[in-house]
Amino acid sequence: MAFLKKSLFLVLFLGLVSLSICDEEKRQDEDDDDDDDEEKRGVFDIIKGAGKQLIARAMGKIAEKVGLNKDGN
């Protein structure tokens, strides 16, 4: 009976250790994914900002050609 208890405790202990290792790896993977998402957002923000500047410049040039000045006259 004592042998079965020790075996059972050993199996449960090893199961808990492997489970905690898997959880730790999962958390690391999630952190890596979060970093990738932040990088993607950073690149998207840069592209979006550049696009806004290009549109503003294009609208300014169009307004100049049409004859509108910055005051709206």
Curated annotation (Swiss-Prot):
Alphabetical GO biological process terms: defense response to bacterium
Residues of the propeptide region, as annotated, are 23-39
The record's tissue-specificity note reads: Expressed by the skin glands.
Query: Looking at the UniProt record for this protein, which Gene Ontology cellular component terms does it annotate, in alphabetical order?
Result: extracellular region
Q: Which superkingdom is the protein from? A: Eukaryota
**UniProt xrefs under InterPro entries:** Frog_antimicrobial_propeptide, FSAP
Asked if the record carries the keyword Ubl conjugation, the reply is no
Q: Which residue positions does the secretion signal occupy?
A: 1-22
List the subcellular locations.
Answer: Secreted
Q: What is known about what this protein does?
A: Has antibacterial activity against Gram-negative bacteria E.coli ATCC 25922 (MIC=60 uM), K.pneumoniae ATCC 700603 (MIC=240 uM) and S.choleraesuis ATCC 14028 (MIC=240 uM) and against Gram-positive bacterium S.aureus ATCC 29313 (MIC=240 uM). Shows no hemolytic activity and no cytotoxicity.
Q: Which family does it belong to?
A: Belongs to the frog skin active peptide (FSAP) family. Ocellatin subfamily.
Would you tell me the protein name for this molecule?
Answer: Ocellatin-PT8
User: In which organism is this protein found?
Assistant: Leptodactylus pustulatus
Q: What is the lineage of its organism?
A: Eukaryota, Metazoa, Chordata, Craniata, Vertebrata
